[in-house]
């Protein structure tokens, strides 16, 4: 199991039956693959859909694409609307959770996930609205950058997407929650010890009294 799959499997355990959820592009889209059988969520997309499903080549519709431009479907009872209504849903607090990738998260619950200096980017898209309007903001990302440096920092160095909005960070090493303004280490991945997490995390954090091993979705792993 690779790092991204582990992260997606853990985040899948965080969603609840009946939730309206927005999944960012990249790693977050994998979360739906690992939802427990008793959890049914409704996917919302910034470009005007409620009730997105996976792409079905037998019932393809060129008008159905998600916010990342990827082909998709829409479930029975799903709805379509313009972007103004879509963002009204988001800004109005009707999205239960959003799952986004991250470039940096710091100990003050700040998120940077849209710009890398020196690279051309189109802008942050709907992420700015999602992190402000969603009831819970979950960041799924690898713990360290390709250079080996920590992505969980004392202070973000990249331009921020949002300030003090992150509720939870899931990496291949650990799960952190922001509780009363403090970064709290709640879980460790299997075969990962506390010292490893400390060595790979720049941010200051406290260890939860109930610090435990991460539990992940077993969907597809059953023999």
From Swiss-Prot:
Known EC number: 2.8.3.8
Pfam families: CoA_trans (PF01144)
Record-linked SUPFAM superfamilies: NagB/RpiA/CoA transferase-like (SSF100950)
Enzymatic reactions: an acyl-CoA + acetate = a carboxylate + acetyl-CoA; acetoacetate + acetyl-CoA = acetoacetyl-CoA + acetate
Pathway entry: Lipid metabolism; short-chain fatty acid metabolism
SMART domains, alphabetized: CoA_trans
The organism's place on the tree of life at top rank: Bacteria
Gene3D superfamilies reported for this sequence: Glutaconate Coenzyme A-transferase
Protein family (similarity comment): Belongs to the 3-oxoacid CoA-transferase subunit B family.
Record note on quaternary structure: Heterotetramer composed of two alpha subunits (AtoD) and two beta subunits (AtoA).
Protein name, per record: Acetate CoA-transferase subunit beta
């Amino acid at each position: 199991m690779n790092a991204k799959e582990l992260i997606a499997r853990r985040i899948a355990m965080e969603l609840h039956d009946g939730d309206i959820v927005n999944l960012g592009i990249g790693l977050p889209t994998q979360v739906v693959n690992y939802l427990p059988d008793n959890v049914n969520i409704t996917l919302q997309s910034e470009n005007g859909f409620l009730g997105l499903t996976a792409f079905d080549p037998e019932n393809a519709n060129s008008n159905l694409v998600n916010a990342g431009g990827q082909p998709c479907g829409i479930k029975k009872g799903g709805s379509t609307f313009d972007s103004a209504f879509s963002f009204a849903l988001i800004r109005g607090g009707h999205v239960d959770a959003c799952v986004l990738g991250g470039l940096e998260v710091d100990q003050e619950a700040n998120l940077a996930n849209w710009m890398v200096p020196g690279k051309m980017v189109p802008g942050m898209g709907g992420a700015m609205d999602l992190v402000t309007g969603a009831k819970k903001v979950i960041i799924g990302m690898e713990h360290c950058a390709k250079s080996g440096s920590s992505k969980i920092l004392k202070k973000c160095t990249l331009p921020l997407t949002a300030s003090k909005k992150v509720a939870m960070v899931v990496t291949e090493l650990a799960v952190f929650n922001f509780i009363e303004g403090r970064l709290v280490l709640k879980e460790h991945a299997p075969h990962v010890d506390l010292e490893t997490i400390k060595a790979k995390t720049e941010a200051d954090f406290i260890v939860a009294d109930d610090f435990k091993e991460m539990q992940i979705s077993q969907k597809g792993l059953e023999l």
